[in-house]
Amino acid sequence: MPFTLGQRWISDTESELGLGTVVAVDARTVTLLFPSTGENRLYARSDSPVTRVMFNPGDTITSHDGWQMQVEEVKEENGLLTYIGTRLDTEESGVALREVFLDSKLVFSKPQDRLFAGQIDRMDRFALRYRARKYSSEQFRMPYSGLRGQRTSLIPHQLNIAHDVGRRHAPRVLLADEVGLGKTIEAGMILHQQLLSGAAERVLIIVPETLQHQWLVEMLRRFNLRFALFDDERYAEAQHDAYNPFDTEQLVICSLDFARRSKQRLEHLCEAEWDLLVVDEAHHLVWSEDAPSREYQAIEQLAEHVPGVLLLTATPEQLGMESHFARLRLLDPNRFHDFAQFVEEQKNYRPVADAVAMLLAGNKLSNDELNMLGEMIGEQDIEPLLQAANSDSEDAQSARQELVSMLMDRHGTSRVLFRNTRNGVKGFPKRELHTIKLPLPTQYQTAIKVSGIMGARKSAEDRARDMLYPERIYQEFEGDNATWWNFDPRVEWLMGYLTSHRSQKVLVICAKAATALQLEQVLREREGIRAAVFHEGMSIIERDRAAAWFAEEDTGAQVLLCSEIGSEGRNFQFASHMVMFDLPFNPDLLEQRIGRLDRIGQAHDIQIHVPYLEKTAQSVLVRWYHEGLDAFEHTCPTGRTIYDSVYNDLINYLASPDQTEGFDDLIKNCREQHEALKAQLEQGRDRLLEIHSNGGEKAQALAESIEEQDDDTNLIAFAMNLFDIIGINQDDRGDNMIVLTPSDHMLVPDFPGLSEDGITITFDREVALAREDTQFITWEHPLIRNGLDLILSGDTGSSTISLLKNKALPVGTLLVELIYVVEAQAPKQLQLNRFLPPTPVRMLLDKNGNNLAAQVEFETFNRQLNAVNRHTGSKLVNAVQQDVHAILQLGEAQIEKSARALIDAARNEADEKLSAELSRLEALRAVNPNIRDDELTAIESNRQQVMESLDQAGWRLDALRLIVVTHQ
């Protein structure tokens, strides 16, 4: 190579050194100084891995003083280059810049510049980059984006609600499904969609203190959303980092008590510019027109500042009309401002719901019902549809469905309220109770007697709580190490049950973590029973491991011993046997326990075993739950109401279980209340609202479509290729699981989402649902999205060179493969990717500009090519640089037509869809006041901004590959 002092070269292997200067040359070696790092490199002259940096007319270059110029002419004298052109800052023409004064921090970003500078990538990286562009573009266009990536079962009614609400601008809705139907999952799906699409960036979740960790776990494990938990300590720490502590995190969970306890804290929350507010257990916010509670006022204040609000609450029938109105008032105070008016409106919807029930049942409608439907829908040309619906023709069924859809659009609160019931959703198992009455040991009898004497001054409630857990009373007197399990008949029964059901997975729940730990030791030491423990003292990772061990079919734990708090938010529906070693204090906790197994997707009837000690509070409570509330074998929406109404009497019976006079009457009264309330709830069911919330056949089709997308083999092939190139080790564990661990040769030292210890992944939804320590990989998983971002945001794979062995073509024939990207720049919240995601356009040009891409498919062509090492590649590029420049100009001339066609198609699609949505809502606004003005304004503004952004769309060269034909 001819080297001259002052020439500028770039290292082929260490491009991060920047532009080097030749500072010494002798017969065998050359020394380069790299000013940007201050380092020297000594190379052999004969075969050094460096490339001469030469710019061409039209290029923009930067001087070491920082000014830029457009090159118009290049002169060479004694091996040194001088660039002549126009300065961009002063517009002075004829400026000369010698190459020695070029900026040393030079970075080649354009693919062609990287190619000509010898920065040649491996061939497989070019292929990965193109696939990443292609798949990324396709995923943005896929229907149901944002609904495919969560680790949940594909349950139609949940998907229906999430699909409807998740696409709205700043949704403000009430999620009021019955217990066990997945309100938390619905909220998570909505958040996931909004965050993924860019419609929301900052989210605040407010929950009761006891549910904070449940939400934290659910959001992380199911949706890969990493929330920060704010309590007093975290809030105080964050005050050192920002004026508003809540500005330090994008996704925050805090308790309602934490939010309302301090005026300054509430002000900080209101000022933090959240996009979405989620409030769980919203039915506990007490409201009346005269005296709203402090908790209600705190949420009301927040709801005024946050555009999107999701309230999770009990069903409207459980709440009562006034309480239900109070929730709706938080969502839209302008619409729901008068309780009396609201009551009147609700009465008016009853005949509509009845008519819908008749439509669905296929019954003929009377003239009065037809007239009422016509008035309710309010369309001028509705008469033919009504007649068709009431006829015996083949079109009758579709006409009835269309009428139901129109009614749902216009129905009072159907846009702000979603409510599913177990009656309306299929797929729940039966629950069968098995009570085991056991004698009270003398040791407990003595301890209870002494406790009664010593605790005479305790309140009835405290005594009742003590009496539920006799082993704790015994330990109070004998010490924490007292071996109560040696004589407690529940332990003997449990061991006998487990040894006779070795093949069954059994979930055992008890109130206290200490009880769970002691039981595990006894089961292991006495019977060799494999038991995992799960309690609040364990970290999330430790709980995951315990849950995963329990989930393993052959070598896993037979038993999972859970404490009350530790099991919150975890579902184990692969098991169907539950043992309640003791009983919880209220019916909500009882339902929460059973809810660990009683979920949609449970394949077997649930066997609930309750071993209880006679003459204790347990014997009182088991009868009250079963005979008074029927709470074991059926969900009990009336439980809390009845519990509150008989609380004092119940406490007294629990505190003094030997005094049972009148207890039978209490049970009888509770059962009567339960039946009456249940009938009242059933009567108050709103069938129209249920149909809207459930989604019917449309929701079923949605679930089936996502299930089909789960089988995308392209994802697996792409992910493995991506992990290989990033440098992530992959170890097949079997059972559709792979362990990923970082290697020493990764593209980046710390890859987001991959810990030092590694992670276990699966592409199988069922495996992910059964094993909580396994991450479910989809196109929406952060690991894939971070990988795509790593490849596409940098220059990985943007320039390469390959050899094509083909004797049908002359040796030395050149082909240039160009990957252009057509894109538009816009704020993320406009969700422009729905219409024009960054879209690759592939061209394969010969020296005459003939585009062969349509005839030569990428993957087929890629398999015919051979790699070239970087050093040889640099020599080839230098030899054909002028020819490549000419082909690039031909490509630039051709891309405009293809790009314009894509942009025009995107404009037409955006205009059609956004205008249609606006027109639909404007028409409905006349008959349904629940369509908010700000929603209409936002859609119109969004449409205008989208169209303006698409008008500014352009294209750029993203990657290129030089192909040289050889016969060897």
Curated annotation (Swiss-Prot):
One of its GO terms (molecular function) is hydrolase activity, acting on acid anhydrides. Residues 164-334 form the Helicase ATP-binding domain. ATP binds at residues 177-184. Its EC number is 3.6.4.-. PROSITE patterns: HELICASE_ATP_BIND_1, HELICASE_CTER. GO terms for biological process: regulation of DNA-templated transcription. Keywords: Activator, ATP-binding, DNA-binding, Helicase, Hydrolase, Nucleotide-binding, Transcription, Transcription regulation. Pfam families: Helicase_C (PF00271), RapA_C (PF12137), SNF2-rel_dom (PF00176), Tudor_1_RapA (PF18339), Tudor_RapA (PF18337). A motif (DEAH box) lies at residues 280-283. It is an enzyme of class 3 (hydrolase). Residues 490-662 form the Helicase C-terminal domain. Interacts with the RNAP. Has a higher affinity for the core RNAP than for the holoenzyme. Its ATPase activity is stimulated by binding to RNAP. NCBIfam families: PRK04914.1 (NF003426). PANTHER family: DNA ANNEALING HELICASE AND ENDONUCLEASE ZRANB3 FAMILY MEMBER, SWI_SNF-RELATED MATRIX-ASSOCIATED ACTIN-DEPENDENT REGULATOR OF CHROMATIN SUBFAMILY A-LIKE PROTEIN 1. Transcription regulator that activates transcription by stimulating RNA polymerase (RNAP) recycling in case of stress conditions such as supercoiled DNA or high salt concentrations. Probably acts by releasing the RNAP, when it is trapped or immobilized on tightly supercoiled DNA. Does not activate transcription on linear DNA. Probably not involved in DNA repair. Belongs to the SNF2/RAD54 helicase family. RapA subfamily. This is RNA polymerase-associated protein RapA. It comes from Escherichia coli O1:K1 / APEC. The gene is rapA.
